From Swiss-Prot:
Ranges annotated as biased composition (Basic and acidic residues): 767-781
GO molecular function, one term: UFM1 ligase activity
The gene coding this protein: ufl1
Localisation: Endoplasmic reticulum membrane; Cytoplasm, Cytosol; Nucleus; Chromosome
Positions of region (Disordered): 405-472, 745-793
Family: Belongs to the UFL1 family.
UniProt name for this protein: E3 UFM1-protein ligase 1
Disulfide bonds: none
Highest classification ranks of the organism: Eukaryota, Metazoa, Chordata, Craniata, Vertebrata
Length: 793
């Protein structure tokens, strides 16, 4: 037996060794990972490895750990914090968190945070504690405190109202929760405050002053007004400019408005606005529906005032006088309102044809007609005087056209002759007068002289004249001030303001009547004028314009001998002097011909434009170009315009031949010599001498300004003897010195210098004068001592 037990113990020891002996064949960690990955890939195993890669976790284990952590964090935890605790990828944590939020009704995923109902209940309890302490809580502030979205928090708290939270949500502003005690206290304050108000008050001011909740104030105020607890009304709804108006004020306001209208007959909109009425016009229309009020810009007027005005206007019309309505008008009315009111009164009375409104006065037409009659004698006297002094400006372009129409028949009979003469002139074979020779050019295309006026029927003439008189508007009868002076003498019972307005109204009809009177006097005077002398005047004019025309051509020839800059200066001078003279002569002739008058006033640029404006288009066009060419720089352009204008006016322009040019040169030289003999001013002596020497050496006439004298002397340097040029240069330097001294003397007279040495300056001036006087005779002799050229030279 002992041997058997020994064998058993030996076998047991071998078995024990076999159990505790390590096996030689086992799986490595790498193989295990590959096996697990293969199983996961084949979807036979659902596990997630940790971030450190040392462990595998099942999704169920992740869910259990999430719920455990949510419980440990009192019902609210961030998903990012869960990822750090569980140590798996954030994607798996978010996925399991979403699964939990979907499967568990008491758990929600809000902005990356898991929140359960237990947390929300505790939050509601905390909010209730704050609410009971303060009486109100602001959900927006709770959102900041608990870092939760407003809609979610509002929904969660609203679900617990009456159960956990003892309060109520504001129906107009769901962002506020109040207790019933707070609402009652607030309502009592609002009721007490508005019960003490006796005038319109802006609700927004009370909100800022007492710190009320805006929505509570409007809702409770509306409730109190509807329940008749407050006697008043809210105007403007729930806007910032809403106003509470107590009934006691509305009653007092209505009483005041009604009383004011009854006593004064008008209501001012601004006064009602100051009373607290925001829309005065609609208020008046509703309050006085049955009253016939006239609404103006700033006020409304009752029938009492309108009836008074109508009675006064009717009396003025019936008595053929005037009436000032200002005393009957409310003083608060603006000028615009006064005009609207008075025009409405005249329109309602239908008396626009019987009376006229002058500011605040109504004047009957009979009174105005009587005032116009006061000026008839003065009008006749002034018309006669105007015809004598200034007949050129009395006839307008319409009169010219009408007068031309009267002569159309007689003019057409001469058309063939003019066309024939025009053709001959173009061929160079026209008639030549006054020794013009073959070089003369006769220009005669259209003649617009108004002959044959007496041959027209007197009735037709009267008809045309009367049609044109109404269009005269250039001759003014009297100024407003002069009319006022006459009215002050004749109308004694009128105020200055009324006379001023009346004069302004009378000025236009008086001027119109005056034009008719002037035209009548003018036509009667011109019809009896001496027509026999017109041919003589025409002949003189023809000769004068031709002489000026040829002189300008000769001046242009002399101008071309200078440089371009000097040519421009001399040309401008010729245009401003001689060319302007011939333009004035031609326009005077046109004015006399087209306006049946031979007289003319001193011509200026303005007068020329005025005359041109009255001419017909066919005559005005070339003459306007002629007038504009005076402001140009080229004499050739002016001559071209002059030829066209003379052609239009029926005048002959003849280019002079050699003989006539020599005659013109001789006459021009003699005239300059006469001026030189009588000249005493050194500057004038130098000017005339230079021009005469220029004509002697070039046989060209020159018409140059004083500032071109140095250029003329420079031109003569190579043309005259050296001693003469030296004398001219010496004399020129003395003249310049004299002009400088005279300029300094004028400055000293204006501003006396301190410590000026008068005697020395006086001696220098006297010495300069003596030297100039001694040389003046020599300068004159350089021209006057030469033999006089003959006319045929």
């Amino acid at each position: 037996m002992a041997a058997d037990w020994e064998e058993i113990r030996r076998l047991a020891a071998d078995f024990q060794r076999a159990q505790f002996a390590e096996t030689v064949q086992r799986l490595s960690e790498r193989n295990c990972i590959e096996i697990v990955s293969k199983l996961v890939e084949d979807k036979k195993l659902d596990v997630v490895h940790t971030l450190d890669g040392k462990e595998y976790v099942t999704p169920a284990q992740i869910s259990r750990e999430i719920r455990d952590e949510l419980y440990m964090h009192r019902g609210r935890i961030n998903v990012v914090d869960l990822q750090k605790i569980i140590n798996v990828d954030l994607v798996h944590v978010e996925g399991r968190a979403n699964e939990i939020a979907k499967s568990d009704r008491g758990t929600q995923l809000i902005l990356g945070q898991l929140i359960d109902e237990a947390y929300l209940d505790r939050l509601a309890e905390e909010v209730n504690d704050k609410l009971q302490e303060a009486g109100q809580v602001n959900i927006a502030e709770l959102c900041k405190t608990y870092d939760l979205p407003g809609d979610f928090l509002t929904e969660a708290l609203n679900a617990r109202l009456g159960r956990v939270i003892q309060g109520q949500l504001d129906q107009y502003n769901r962002g506020m929760i109040f207790t019933q005690a707070f609402l009652s206290r607030h309502k009592a304050c609002i009721c007490g405050l508005f019960s003490g108000i006796t005038r319109p008050t802006q609700i927004n001011n009370l909100l800022n002053l007492y710190g009320f909740q805006e929505n509570l104030v409007y809702s409770m105020l509306e409730e109190l007004v509807n329940s008749a607890r407050l006697k008043g009304s809210v105007v403007g709804g729930r806007q910032d400019k809403a106003i509470y108006i107590p009934d006691i004020y509305s009653k007092a306001q209505s009483t005041w408005v009604e009383s004011f209208l009854k006593q004064n007959g008008y209501l001012e909109f601004e006064s009602l606005t100051r009373l607290g009425i925001p829309d005065p016009i609609n208020y008046i229309k509703k309050r006085f529906k049955s009253s016939r009020l006239l609404f103006l810009k700033t006020a409304c007027v009752g029938r009492t005032i309108v009836d008074q005005l109508e009675a006064s206007v009717e009396e003025a019309i019936n008595s053929a006088t005037w009436v000032d309505l200002q005393p009957m008008l409310p003083s608060i009315l603006s000028e615009e309102d006064v005009g609207i009111l008075l025009n409405e009164v005249l329109r309602s009375m239908n008396v626009q044809s019987s009376a006229r409104l002058l500011s605040t006065s109504v004047v009957s037409e009979k009174f105005i007609a009587g005032c116009i009659a006061l000026f008839e004698d003065l009008m006749q006297q002034k018309a006669q005087k105007e015809v004598k002094n200034n007949p050129v400006f009395l006839i307008t372009e319409d009169d010219v056209k009408q007068s031309s129409a009267l002569l159309e028949t007689s003019a057409s009979s001469k058309k063939d002759k003019r066309d024939e003469r025009r053709k001959k002139a173009a061929e160079g074979g026209g008639s030549v007068k006054s020794g013009g020779g073959g070089n003369a050019r006769e220009i005669r295309i259209r003649k617009t002289k108004k002959k044959g006026r007496k041959e027209e029927d007197s009735d037709e003439e009267t008809t045309h004249s009367s049609q044109g008189r109404n269009k005269l508007g250039d001759v003014q009868f009297l100024s407003v001030e002069e009319i006022v002076e006459v009215l002050e003498e004749k109308v004694c019972d009128s105020s200055e303001e009324m006379l001023q307005e009346l004069a302004e109204q009378l000025q236009r009809p008086l001027s119109k009547m005056y034009q008719e009177v002037v035209t009548t006097a003018f036509l009667s005077t011109s019809s009896s004028g001496a027509g026999g002398s017109r041919k003589k005047n025409m002949k003189d004019l023809q000769e004068e314009i031709n002489n000026l025309y040829n002189n300008i051509r000769l001046f242009e020839k002399g101008t071309k001998l200078f440089s371009d800059e000097t040519q421009a200066t001399v040309a401008k001078h010729v245009l401003k002097t001689v060319c302007t003279d011939v333009t004035n002569v031609l326009l005077s002739f046109v004015a006399a011909e087209h306006m049946t008058s031979d007289s003319s006033a001193a011509m200026t640029s303005e007068i020329r434009l005025k005359i041109l404006a009255k001419l017909s288009d066919e005559v005005r066009s070339p003459l306007m170009k002629l007038h504009n060419s005076l402001n140009g720089k080229a004499i050739e352009e002016f001559l071209s315009c002059l030829e066209t204008s003379a052609e239009e006016c029926g005048l002959f322009l003849k280019k002079g031949d050699k003989k006539r040019e020599r005659q013109a040169l001789s006459v021009h030289r003699q005239a300059l010599c006469e001026q030189l003999r009588d000249a005493e001013d050194p500057a004038l002596v130098l000017h005339l001498t230079s021009v005469l020497l220029f004509q002697n050496v070039t046989h060209c006439m020159l018409h140059a300004p004083g500032r071109c004298v140095p250029h003329i002397i420079g031109f003569l340097q190579s043309k005259i003897p050296e001693d003469q040029h030296k004398l001219l240069s010496q004399y020129q330097s003395l003249v310049v010195k004299q002009l400088v001294v005279q300029g300094h003397g004028a400055e000293k007279k204006t501003v006396p210098p301190e410590g000026a040495g008068g005697p020395a300056d006086s001696d220098d001036t006297e010495s300069l004068q003596r030297e100039l006087h001694s040389l003046s005779r020599d300068i004159k002799d350089t021209v006057l001592a030469q033999r006089k050229p003959s006319v045929t030279e």
